[in-house]
């Protein structure tokens, strides 16, 4: 009973501490941007930003904001995860207690905020529950007894090759998505460097001094993951839009009457070079193919050795490796498509109700350019591995045949040489010995004659 009560207390502490640290940090930064003291308006704005980071947007008289700052969401989930691991609130009782407290705090924020919320009460609380649950599960599931029992069961019931195939499939999906996001970050940096003059012009137009510019730039970073995802879609051919006012692709970059928001100053121009457009469009295919080939041939992957087809005993494992790699590639392509759909959907939002009602990417089009190219790249990697092995087999067979034919042709010649060497090694008889052999021999008669 004491253990259960302890878990309830720990769960409540996790929820209270997480919200306190998170809300106080946001409130201090908001006050730093708006004034020296925490005011009623700052507190309400902080509460609205907390709800916004959980996916619940708000509206004012001048604009509507529903673009979830994904960097804040990631930090909030990480904070919940870290406190759960620190306090060791892993049990289901801790989760229930923490979730109740967390929902209570979010409901208090929802009722106290002076800004109009876009979502209904049940949807606000549902999104808050999802955020807390993700943070809790990321910390508790790996440490739970049921997960350890499940891992033990899979080790006993599931063959090692299948488990390895599933692990490689998930690892490939994570690796390829990480590379795509890194490329998106690099693209955003390139945009910022190339278009910094436009950002400076927007700062000057808004009348911001150096301090305000720094604080505004830092505040804009909370949407960095969103812009990274837009950059991935733009680079791979999907593009993105700022409502009805602007559309950006590799071929098109037009805008009209965009709001004077500094972050809009970094948005890209169309790429004029046909070569660079081709490179960008084929980048996901090349990345997936390269990662797939590494997974097939590296020892940490499927360790496929084409030269093993020379021996009948080692030929079977090579074919088995190809079969399992095909399964892993299918799993990776499916996971990447699902993850891309979810991430692109989360990155979208709105800044208004009319011309700025939709800001972000076309989810289906962006998922198609990413998922389709990735699947083609993984398929190309598997086919290249198959073709390589198929080429090695006839080459090895031909080399062995040539060796056999050379050995067969060399055997009679070798026998003739050995015979000649044998005859040459015999001692030669002298002329006297030969004459003695040919002289008549005198033998004594028996004395018997014919009558």
Task: Tell where the protein language model's regions lie, with residue ranges.
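Cytoplasmic membrane-interface segments at the C-terminal ends of transmembrane helices
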Residues: 1-9, 78-92, 135-170, 193, ...
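Alpha-helical membrane-inserting segments
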Residues: 21-29, 80-84, 105-112, 134-142, ...
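Hydrophobic alpha-helical transmembrane segments of integral membrane proteins
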Residues: 87-127, 258-279, 295-351, 416, ...
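Membrane-interface helix-loop-helix junctions at boundaries between adjacent transmembrane segments
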Residues: 83-178, 185-214
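Alpha-helical transmembrane segments and their helix-start/interface "positive-inside/aromatic belt" motifs
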Residues: 1-24, 83-95, 121-130, 163-181, ...
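Long, glycine/tryptophan/cysteine-rich extracytoplasmic
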Residues: 2-78, 111-114, 203-285, 345-427, ...
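Hydrophobic faces of alpha-helical transmembrane segments in multi-pass integral membrane proteins
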Residues: 13-17, 21, 72, 76, ...
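Intrinsically disordered terminal tails
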Residues: 449-451
């Amino acid at each position: 009973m004491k253990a259960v009560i302890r878990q309830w207390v720990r769960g409540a502490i996790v929820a209270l501490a997480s919200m306190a640290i998170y809300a106080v940090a946001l409130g201090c930064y908001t006050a730093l941007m708006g004034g020296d003291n925490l005011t009623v308006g700052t507190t309400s704005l902080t509460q609205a930003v907390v709800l916004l980071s959980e996916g619940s947007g708000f509206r004012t008289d001048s604009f509507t904001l529903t673009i979830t700052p994904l960097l804040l969401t990631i930090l909030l989930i990480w904070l919940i995860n870290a406190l759960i691991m620190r306090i060791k609130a892993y049990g289901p009782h801790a989760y229930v207690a923490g979730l109740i407290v967390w929902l209570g705090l979010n409901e208090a924020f929802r009722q106290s905020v002076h800004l109009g919320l876009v979502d209904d009460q049940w949807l606000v609380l549902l999104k808050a529950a999802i955020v807390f649950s993700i943070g809790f599960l990321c910390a508790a599931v790996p440490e739970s007894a049921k997960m350890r029992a499940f891992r033990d069961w899979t080790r006993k019931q599931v063959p090692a090759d299948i488990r390895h195939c599933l692990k490689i499939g998930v690892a490939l999906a994570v690796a390829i998505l990480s590379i795509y996001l890194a490329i998106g970050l690099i693209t955003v940096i390139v945009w910022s460097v190339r278009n910094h003059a436009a950002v400076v012009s927007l700062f000057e137009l808004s009348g911001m001094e150096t301090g305000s510019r720094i604080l505004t730039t830092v505040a804009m970073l909370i949407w960095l993951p969103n812009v990274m995802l837009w950059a991935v879609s733009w680079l791979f051919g999907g593009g993105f839009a700022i409502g009805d006012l602007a559309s950006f692709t590799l071929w098109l970059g037009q805008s009209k009457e965009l709001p004077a928001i500094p972050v809009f100053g970094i948005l890209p121009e169309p790429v004029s070079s046909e070569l660079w457009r081709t490179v960008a469009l084929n980048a996901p295919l090349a990345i997936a193919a390269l990662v797939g080939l590494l997974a097939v041939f590296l020892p940490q992957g499927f360790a496929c050795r084409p030269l093993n087809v020379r021996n009948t005993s080692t030929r079977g494992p090579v074919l088995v490796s190809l079969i399992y790699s095909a399964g892993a590639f299918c799993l990776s392509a499916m996971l990447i498509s699902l993850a891309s759909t979810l991430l692109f959907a989360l990155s979208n939002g709105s800044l208004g109700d009319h011309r700025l009602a939709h800001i972000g990417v076309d989810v289906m089009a962006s998922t198609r350019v990413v998922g389709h190219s990735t699947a083609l790249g993984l398929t190309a990697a598997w086919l290249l591995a198959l073709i390589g092995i198929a080429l090695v087999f006839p080459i090895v067979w031909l080399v062995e045949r040539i060796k056999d034919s050379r050995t067969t042709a060399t055997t009679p010649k070798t026998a003739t040489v050995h015979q000649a060497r044998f005859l040459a090694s015999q001692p030669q008889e002298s002329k006297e010995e030969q004459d003695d052999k040919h002289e008549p021999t005198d033998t004594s008669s028996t004395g018997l004659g014919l009558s």
